[in-house]
């Protein structure tokens, strides 16, 4: 059945005019390096994501090794490298190295591929730039803990796991009672000022977590993700103004506690540090240049930049097509441009190349969760990760018409007409 699913995915991918890849290498709980490759294609009048393959890195995890696996699989799948318009990665040295990284080898095959750094995996600017007072509180909560690295990793890299901190804070009363009974030496955990600092950390990481989850999903693209990052940056400016006025509505847990003057100053300083580093880690994309992609009927073609003459000509014709204008209001942006491709191919393909690339590795996180389950000690049978990962694909169900019935199946009798 997994072979049937793989065959469907490969056929759909080959039929797509263009495709984008998303890949990442990580080590599973057995210590084995796994490479997940996802593909985004145009299929069934929409843009869809799918797991292309999961490959084990048997020896080293160098950029050249990753390139060889990707390149060989694309050859096996009959997917021309020149049809790939973008690759989204987590920005690890093996991927981004200018000489021996995956990107350098790939550029030799197709210099037009656009590489993007996953929005979710840009290291949180909050970990290294948090005010010293908060960093001390955050660090002491992880001290002497076997899971300290997991907690930091959770809050910094995979922010959806930031719930760990929320759970810790919400159990503060129970923790204090337990430590009192046990006569614990960690006296700072009974310090109200310390818990007030933790309350702010919990609130700010919750905001970061919401931002993180908002840029996930199959309908996300670079434009929508950029919108949300820009909105968050503007909110930080608003929050600092409110904090300077001693208004903490945006930090509900902090607002419930006795906030002293020094803490207000620390919060204000931390928000500014976060804003500065957000600007550094998430460079501004001039999304205004792509308003024609979001709504081609509301822009002046003379103001659109970056288009060739033939594309501008196509856009003018499309903009004045009343039938398409009505269709636009009935469809998603992705479906609209795929629909318009038949009549206006040049401008439609230009739009699709902007919408198609991945902006996040959210499926990567789901994929490695599946891999963890596959190799769990609870499994009572031996099967390779690659085989099992085929069954974890999110594509349409396998073609069961070609699957033989189980042995011993009894078919009902039918009367002859």
Where are each of the predicted segments found?
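Alpha-helical structural modules in large enzymes and assemblies
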Residues: 1-417
């Amino acid at each position: 059945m997994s072979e049937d699913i793989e065959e469907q995915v490969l056929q759909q991918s080959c039929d797509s005019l263009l495709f984008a890849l998303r890949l990442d290498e990580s080590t599973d709980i057995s210590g084995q390096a796994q490479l997940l490759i996802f593909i985004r294609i145009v299929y069934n009048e929409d843009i869809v994501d799918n797991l292309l393959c999961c490959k084990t890195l048997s020896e080293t995890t160098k950029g050249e090794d990753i390139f060889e696996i990707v390149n060989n699989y694309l050859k096996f799948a009959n997917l021309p490298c020149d049809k790939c318009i973008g690759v989204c990665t987590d920005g690890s040295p093996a991927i981004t190295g200018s000489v021996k990284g995956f990107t350098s080898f790939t550029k030799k095959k197709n210099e037009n591929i656009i590489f993007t750094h996953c929005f979710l995996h840009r290291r949180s600017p909050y970990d290294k730039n948090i005010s010293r007072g908060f960093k001390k509180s955050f660090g002491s909560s992880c001290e002497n803990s076997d899971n300290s690295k997991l907690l930091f990793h959770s809050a910094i890299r995979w922010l959806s796991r930031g719930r760990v901190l929320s759970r810790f804070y919400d159990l503060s009363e129970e923790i204090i009672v337990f430590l009192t009974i046990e006569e614990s030496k960690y006296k700072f955990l009974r310090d109200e000022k310390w818990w007030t600092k933790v309350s702010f950390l919990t609130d700010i990481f919750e905001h970061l977590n919401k931002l993180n989850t908002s840029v996930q999903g199959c309908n996300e693209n670079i434009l929508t993700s950029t919108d949300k990052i820009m909105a968050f940056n503007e909110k930080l400016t608003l929050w600092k103004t409110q904090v300077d006025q001693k208004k903490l509505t945006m930090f509900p847990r902090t607002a419930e506690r006795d906030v002293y003057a020094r803490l207000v100053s620390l919060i204000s300083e931390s928000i500014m540090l976060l804003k500065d580093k957000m600007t550094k880690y998430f460079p501004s994309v001039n999304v205004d240049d792509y308003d024609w992609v979001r709504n081609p009927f509301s822009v002046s073609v003379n103001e659109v930049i970056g288009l060739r003459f033939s594309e501008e000509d196509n856009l003018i014709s499309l903009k004045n097509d009343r039938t398409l204008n009505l269709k636009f209001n009935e469809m998603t942006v992705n479906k609209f441009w795929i629909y318009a491709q038949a009549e206006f191919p040049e401008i439609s393909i230009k739009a699709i190349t902007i919408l198609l690339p991945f902006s996040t590795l959210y499926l990567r996180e789901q994929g490695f969760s599946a891999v963890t389950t596959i190799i769990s000690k609870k499994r009572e049978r031996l099967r390779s990760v690659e085989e099992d990962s085929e069954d974890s694909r999110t594509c349409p169900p396998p073609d069961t018409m070609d699957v033989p019935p189980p042995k011993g199946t009894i078919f009902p009798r039918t009367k002859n007409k």
